[in-house]
């Protein structure tokens, strides 16, 4: 909660607890406005934002022991993007074009499908959800040409790939069983890759 509060201050009051909760807890973290079926609830947190009070439930997915050899490869585009600015951009877009709200609903449905696949150890299903999510995010205009190139380069060697974070720059992530090939593909596009095992542990106090 302290880390989330610090991030919110840096992002001018707009920040979800996703990054800080994942870094602290490790594994597979699900951040939602409520407890999510099929997950284990850990704690709740809230934040006063320029748009009003926000509340989140922090949940985790206990991965099956036979999940297999799966990796996440992050690709940094080299361009930063303040979360607050991108959140405001999407809010303004939906305000001007209310029909775009269906993309937000699509992302919610895709996320639930991906969560079901992850809980069952279905990596192919999870990858399909990631691909579909990226397309919806593109329609919300939060992707960039660089992120799209990195995602496209990673997909032939991945189960799925999408932008991660607020968009507008920043990073993409690919789910793969061949992290070396994906890292090479990201580097060819000018991105900087980082590999981590799916379900890695969070912060450890030494």
Q: Where do the protein language model's features map onto the residues?
A:
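C-terminal nucleotide
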Residues: 4-14, 20-162, 166, 173-206
């Amino acid at each position: 909660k302290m880390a989330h509060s610090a991030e919110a201050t840096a992002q001018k009051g707009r920040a979800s607890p996703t990054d800080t909760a994942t870094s602290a807890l490790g594994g597979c973290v699900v951040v939602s406005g409520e407890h999510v079926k099929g997950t284990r609830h850990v704690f709740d947190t809230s934040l006063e934002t320029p748009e009003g009070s926000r509340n989140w439930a922090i949940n985790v997915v206990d991965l099956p022991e036979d999940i297999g050899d799966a990796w996440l490869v992050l690709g940094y585009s080299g361009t930063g993007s303040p979360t607050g600015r991108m959140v405001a951009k999407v809010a303004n877009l939906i305000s001007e074009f209310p029909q775009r709200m269906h993309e937000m609903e699509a992302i919610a449905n895709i996320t639930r499908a991906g969560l079901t696949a992850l809980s069952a150890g279905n990596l192919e299903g999870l990858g399909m959800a990631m691909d579909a999510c990226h397309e919806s995010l593109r329609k919300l205009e939060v992707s960039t040409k660089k992120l799209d190139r990195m995602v496209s380069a990673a997909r032939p060697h991945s189960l799925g790939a999408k932008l991660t974070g607020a968009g507008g720059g920043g990073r993409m992530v690919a789910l793969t069983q061949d992290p070396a090939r994906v890292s090479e593909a990201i580097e060819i596009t000018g991105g900087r890759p980082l590999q981590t095992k799916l379900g890695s542990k969070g912060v450890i106090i030494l």
